[in-house]
């Protein structure tokens, strides 16, 4: 049979004020693209006519400008989870306009199944192809796995965007598998990075499908900034640390799978590892595969890669599709509850590497908020990996804003990963190995190896004035560097004596 075809505007007109919408995708890749471009226009028109119009948006991870950015600018988002990297969304959230839950990405599907977000009125998913059965639709996903099997099963209605920008052979990259809910859950049978345990397609109750929007729209993912001397040095520091750990016997000689977060720093780490002849051929078990991974897969430095999203440039995506016979044997796209599963991460011994906004001298880490209050992005999947990884590494530049902000501080203004979950901190200055060390030894390691030289005397001074205890802190001066930045615009102007009067 053939399902009803709709224009994007017709599809947007079927969405109601206060609807909760679940979306495919994970990062900008794999998200529906046509319907939301019309929905944001509709929201503006509704508001201009004096009528309310807002929706809740539930996804696997971040999405795109045409979803989060334009909808936030149209004041059309009532609730959002679990993650965002969009500037417009961030601005409106920090103005208090959007109710945003920053949540571990690996938890999203099961929280939906447990009903924590209420009913899903509509699921909108992107496919490269589909089999239009009378009772069951087999939907072949594009460049991301996300939370699709869960949202199409739970949603009252399903809208499909068939995007012919993607090759129909994208199906050969997917391993679609939904975890059973407690108390009927069984072990996830992934024993190796490349294991396939599910199907190439998501199954949808055909009676729920209200229509199909056909389009040909490229992905919105962009290339990251080119590496500079600072990010390159951080990458080399991570690579040197891992090689040293392998020589010490802490890492097996065959190496272990790597997870790396998203962004320029993560690419720098992968570049350094890929180029270093002392690092064996390795595998990647992560949530997002970027261009660097594809490059080193082609060169034979990366054997297998598993992810929830192929977040690469459109040129690289085309390369993957054009060489699908190779990549279908070495690259797997999973649901985020499998890519980010604590069970699988621990079983495989994944080495976790993610980016921090700031770390304090005792090893606590902040991924999400500036000076405690202002949302930057969110935790994403970092904690899924860092809490369960074989080794948990955070990287950050030692300073930002031309040296006015130190990423190493006495106390984090917001904590996402605690000192109990952080094994290693890396900046361009060096590496602090926190394993097997108490608070004071950790503090000295971080100050001397990771802090910028401009800030080391200040941080040493803080240790002297902090009240004695297992983990010395001064409640009056712990956030003095942040307070000074807010008042004077430069943490280097901090005078602890002003806070001890």
Give the location of each predicted region.
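Conserved alpha/beta enzyme-core scaffold
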Residues: 1-501
């Amino acid at each position: 049979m053939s399902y009803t075809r709709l224009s994007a505007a017709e599809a947007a007109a079927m969405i109601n004020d206060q609807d909760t919408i679940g979306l495919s995708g994970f990062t900008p890749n794999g998200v529906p693209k046509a319907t939301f471009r019309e929905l944001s226009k509709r929201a503006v028109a509704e508001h201009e006519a004096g009528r309310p119009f807002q929706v809740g948006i539930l996804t696997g991870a971040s999405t795109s400008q045409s979803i989060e950015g334009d909808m936030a600018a149209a004041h059309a988002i009532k609730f959002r989870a679990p993650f965002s990297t969009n500037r417009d969304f961030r601005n409106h959230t920090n103005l208090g306009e959007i109710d945003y839950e920053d949540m571990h990405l690996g938890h999203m599907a099961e929280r939906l199944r447990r009903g924590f977000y209420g009913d899903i009125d509509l699921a909108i998913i992107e496919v490269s192809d589909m089999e239009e059965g009378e009772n069951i639709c087999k939907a072949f996903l594009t460049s991301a796995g996300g939370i699709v099997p869960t949202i199409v099963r739970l949603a009252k209605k399903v809208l499909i965007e068939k995007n012919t920008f993607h090759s129909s052979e994208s199906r050969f990259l997917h391993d679609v598998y939904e975890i059973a809910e407690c108390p009927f859950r069984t072990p996830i049978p992934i024993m190796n990075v490349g294991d396939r345990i599910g199907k190439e397609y998501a199954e949808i109750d055909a009676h729920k499908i209200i229509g199909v929007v056909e389009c040909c729209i490229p992905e919105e993912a962009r290339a990251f900034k080119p590496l500079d001397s600072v990010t390159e040095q951080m990458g080399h520091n991570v690579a040197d640390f891992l090689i040293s750990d392998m020589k010490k016997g802490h890492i097996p000689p065959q190496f272990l799978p790597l997870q790396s977060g998203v962004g320029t720093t993560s690419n720098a780490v992968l570049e350094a590892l890929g180029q270093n002849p002392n690092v064996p051929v390795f595998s990647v078990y992560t949530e997002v595969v970027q261009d660097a991974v594809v490059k080193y897969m082609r060169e034979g430095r990366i054997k297998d890669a598993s992810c929830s999203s192929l977040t690469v440039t459109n040129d690289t995506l085309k390369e993957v599709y054009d060489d699908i016979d190779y990549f279908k044997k070495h690259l797997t796209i999973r649901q985020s509850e499998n890519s980010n599963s604590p069970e699988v991460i621990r079983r495989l011994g994944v080495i976790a590497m993610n980016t921090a906004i700031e770390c304090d001298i005792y090893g606590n880490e902040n991924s999400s908020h500036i000076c405690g209050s202002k949302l930057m992005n969110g935790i994403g999947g970092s904690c899924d990996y860092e809490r369960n990884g074989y080794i948990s590494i955070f990287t950050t530049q030692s300073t930002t804003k031309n040296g006015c902000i130190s990423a190493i501080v006495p106390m984090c203004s917001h904590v996402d990963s605690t000192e109990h979950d952080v094994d290693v901190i890396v900046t361009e200055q060096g590496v602090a190995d926190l394993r097997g060390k108490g608070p004071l030894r950790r503090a000295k390691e971080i100050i001397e190896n990771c802090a910028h030289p401009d800030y080391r005397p200040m941080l040493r001074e803080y240790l002297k004035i902090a009240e004695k205890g297992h983990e010395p802190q001064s409640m009056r001066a712990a956030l003095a560097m942040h307070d000074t930045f807010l008042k004077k615009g430069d943490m280097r102007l901090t005078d602890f004596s002003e806070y001890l009067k």
